[in-house]
Amino acid sequence: AWLTNHFLRDRVHASAAAADAAPVDPRLIAVLSEIGIAVTDCMTKAEEDFAEETFDYVITLLGDAGEKCLLHGATSYCGRCNAVCPHLQQTSHGGKRVYFTGILDPSRSLGSDDEIREAYRKARDEIKDVLVRFFREVSLDKP
């Protein structure tokens, strides 16, 4: 949500949720601050915190969610082939379910602190690229 709200702030408002509320990893806060994004809320919200809200899109970002586009076996937007599939699933929040696959969860990275921080940078940059591309394709980023 921080990336979307930073780079597409005039056109999109995003909220972020995790399966359970948890502290935000300090390495994520650090790599976001490298590109000018200040993280002020240091806890993720749980999905249940949004139970009464509706959204245009519910987006799952990380590749280990197990969802892929039609070309790769499911019905969703695919970050691997960068295309919107024709049958987006509806969610309980009223929005279309969209998956970006192929982005590894940096919180599961192993190695030195520098290697893990680099995994966060890579995920940050990949997520930014696919979100900007996605919102352009759904006409939210056209002047």
Label every PLM stretch briefly.
Residues 60-61:
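Redox-cofactor binding/interface segments in oxidoreductases and associated redox assembly factors
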Residues 22-25, 65-69:
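Short, charged/polar "capping" segments at the starts of alpha-helices
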Residues 1-51:
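Conserved active-site segments centered on acidic
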Residues 56:
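Conserved acidic residues
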